[in-house]
Amino acid sequence: MTRQAIVAANWKMNGDSALVDTMVSGLADIELSSHVDVVICPSFPYLSELNQKIKAANLNEAIHVGSQNVSEHESGAYTGEVSTAMLQNLAINYVIVGHSERRSIFKETSTQVAKKVHAALNAGLTPILCIGESEAERATGETETVLSAQIQPVIDEIGIEKFKDVVIAYEPVWAIGTGKTASSAMAQETHQFIRKFLAQQNEQVADKVPLLYGGSVNAANCEELFAQTDIDGGLIGGASLKAEQFKIICSAAKGK
């Protein structure tokens, strides 16, 4: 079946107002089909600015703004956190949840990630759930076990039916920012496993979930990756900071 193709830019802790301007002007003439969503996720201080400039450039139908994180709590004494209501107030559509850097550096657990997915869905936001294994885990044949253990708590939290409103981004930890990329065949094999894992509980829902690949995706390898049956787009890191590269990657998703 035809699923929504998504190309999401994760700027991480990079960029400034100048990058916002460069990206909006660089994407001004982007041509996309209706089944491709482009999402740009800057750091929190630039969410509103990016949204306003996208609207001013009449790009708001083609490009959405997303957050790199969100709290699982509605409000309260959680210094430094940002709630779903705050993102709603800024007209944010997407939110990245459970990125490997959040899991490893900030010690977010799969249970906490599941609660963040739930909070995002309750607020009408589309969560981009990140999962992925380390190089050591792949070397010892644990990839499927690790991914299952990251997905199952979310199923337990929200139920499989609600996955029709969830995007999953598979990012092998060993490929993030390293220049290493899973081969297209390896990426497809893992994406196929993820879809089959979901299908064990609900095949119809599994067929609808967009699965993105992340991990050193660039203008040179995006077309081959996106040509794979179960890869519906990408979560892009370093290459998303360069407007010309990012435009090429977005255009490659048109073939999905």
Curated annotation (Swiss-Prot):
Known role: Involved in the gluconeogenesis. Catalyzes stereospecifically the conversion of dihydroxyacetone phosphate (DHAP) to D-glyceraldehyde-3-phosphate (G3P).
Record-listed substrate binding positions: N10, W11, K12, G177, S216, G237, G238
Pathway the protein takes part in: Carbohydrate biosynthesis; gluconeogenesis; Carbohydrate degradation; glycolysis; D-glyceraldehyde 3-phosphate from glycerone phosphate: step 1/1
UniProt keyword Acetylation present: no
Active-site residues, as the UniProt record annotates them: H99, E171
Cellular-component GO terms for this entry: cytosol
GO MF annotation, one: triose-phosphate isomerase activity
Subcellular location: Cytoplasm
Record keywords, A-Z: Cytoplasm, Gluconeogenesis, Glycolysis, Isomerase
Catalytic activity reported: D-glyceraldehyde 3-phosphate = dihydroxyacetone phosphate
Main localization category: cytoplasm
NCBIfam families (alphabetical): tim
UniProt family annotation: Belongs to the triosephosphate isomerase family.
GO biological process: gluconeogenesis; glyceraldehyde-3-phosphate biosynthetic process; glycerol catabolic process; glycolytic process
InterPro entries noted in UniProt: Aldolase_TIM, TIM_sf, TrioseP_Isoase_bac/euk, Triosephosphate_isomerase, Triosephosphate_isomerase_AS
Domain of life: Bacteria
Name of the protein described by the UniProt record: Triosephosphate isomerase
EC number: 5.3.1.1
Subunit structure: Homodimer.
